[in-house]
C-alpha cells in the first residue's frame, strides 16, 4: 500500500508529540518500536481510514471485526481470528492524528465512520485500548473505562493503557415525518 510509509510516519509523529505529557521518551520509543504501527489486517479488511489535507496525511484510524485489540504488524501478541458480532464488540483501532491537526474534529469524524460501519456489520458494542492521551477524547464520544492494563514493552519499560467500551444505539433515524390524516 502506497500510504503505508506515510501512515507509519504519522503514527510516530503523533505518538512523539501528543504523548509527551503522559509517557516518558523511553515508553514512547518502545511503543513505536514494538506496538504502534500499521496493521495490515485492517487495510486488507478495508476498515482502516486516513484523513488527508494539502499537508498530506493528517489522521488515521479504523475498526475491526478481528479479535486483536491493539498493535501493528510488529506486535507479537496478535490474534487475527474473527469476532462474533452478536456476542462480541467490534474493535476500534490505531487512531493517530498529526500534532498540527489535533483537536480539530478529525478523530471524531473517523470514529463516526467506524461506528457506522461496525453497526452495519451487526456489531452492537465497541471496545478499544486507549493510550493515556486518548482517554478524554474517547470518554467524550461515549466510551467508558472498563479496567487498567500495563503492557510490558521491554524488561524495563511498561506502558499504561486503559481498555474502554461503548454500547451503540440503534441505527440512527434518517427521517421523521408527520402522518397524514385519513
Regions flagged by a language model, labelled:
Residues 45, 52, 58-102, 112, ...:
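Conserved acyl-donor/pantetheine-binding loop and adjacent beta-alpha core of acyl/acetyltransferases
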Residues 105-107:
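Conserved G/P- and acidic residue-centered "switch" motifs that form tight phosphate/ATP-binding loops
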Residues 180-181:
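Short, intrinsically disordered C-terminal tails of secreted or membrane-associated proteins
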Amino acid at each position: 500500500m502506497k500510504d503505508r510509509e506515510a501512515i507509519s510516519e504519522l503514527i510516530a509523529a503523533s505518538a512523539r508529540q501528543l504523548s509527551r505529557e503522559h509517557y516518558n521518551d523511553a515508553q514512547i520509543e518502545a511503543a513505536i518500536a514494538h506496538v504502534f504501527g500499521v496493521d495490515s489486517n485492517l487495510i486488507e479488511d478495508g476498515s482502516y481510514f486516513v484523513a488527508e489535507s494539502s499537508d498530506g496525511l493528517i489522521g488515521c484510524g479504523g475498526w475491526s471485526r478481528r479479535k486483536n485489540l491493539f498493535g501493528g504488524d510488529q506486535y507479537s501478541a496478535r490474534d487475527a481470528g474473527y469476532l462474533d458480532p452478536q456476542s462480541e464488540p467490534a474493535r476500534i483501532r490505531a487512531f493517530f492524528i498529526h500534532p498540527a491537526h489535533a483537536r480539530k474534529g478529525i478523530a471524531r469524524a473517523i470514529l463516526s465512520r467506524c461506528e457506522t460501519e461496525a453497526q452495519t456489520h451487526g456489531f452492537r458494542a465497541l471496545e478499544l485500548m486507549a493510550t493515556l492521551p486518548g482517554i478524554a477524547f474517547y470518554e467524550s464520544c461515549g466510551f467508558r473505562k472498563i479496567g487498567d492494563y500495563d503492557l510490558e514493552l521491554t524488561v524495563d519499560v511498561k506502558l499504561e493503557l486503559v481498555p474502554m467500551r461503548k454500547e451503540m444505539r440503534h441505527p440512527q433515524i434518517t427521517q421523521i415525518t408527520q402522518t397524514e390524516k385519513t
